[in-house]
């Protein structure tokens, strides 16, 4: 699942960059910029859907990766497991900042 995580992360970064090129965060124009992305940008609706659904698939892959680590007893490798827990917390904080706060 590590390779799927890498693929999901690369897809999220690319689609996020493409969406950020057309998005404005001003309170009066934010909704119209999303409408602009979906209607006027070539395949903007597809980029937006890939970005939204890719985030869900990314977390599914993370949970499967953690489940595999639990099944095979990888938690016995303390340093590696703790780094993974820190990475999971960072990913969850980033998702909160990117989804809830805007």
Swiss-Prot record:
Heme b b566 binds at residue 65. It is found in: Mitochondrion inner membrane. Belongs to the cytochrome b family. GO terms for cellular component: mitochondrial inner membrane. The chain crosses the membrane at residues 1-21, 45-66, 81-101. InterPro entries: Cyt_b/b6_N, Cytb/b6-like_sf, Di-haem_cyt_TM. Binds 2 heme b groups non-covalently. It is a multi-pass membrane protein. Component of the ubiquinol-cytochrome c reductase complex (complex III or cytochrome b-c1 complex) that is part of the mitochondrial respiratory chain. The b-c1 complex mediates electron transfer from ubiquinol to cytochrome c. Contributes to the generation of a proton gradient across the mitochondrial membrane that is then used for ATP synthesis. This is Cytochrome b. Its cofactor is heme b. One of its GO terms (biological process) is mitochondrial electron transport, ubiquinol to cytochrome c. One of its GO terms (molecular function) is metal ion binding. Heme b b562 binds at residue 51. The cytochrome bc1 complex contains 3 respiratory subunits (MT-CYB, CYC1 and UQCRFS1), 2 core proteins (UQCRC1 and UQCRC2) and probably 6 low-molecular weight proteins. Heme 1 (or BL or b562) is low-potential and absorbs at about 562 nm, and heme 2 (or BH or b566) is high-potential and absorbs at about 566 nm. Keywords: Electron transport, Heme, Iron, Membrane, Metal-binding, Mitochondrion, Mitochondrion inner membrane, Respiratory chain, Transmembrane, Transmembrane helix, Transport, Ubiquinone.
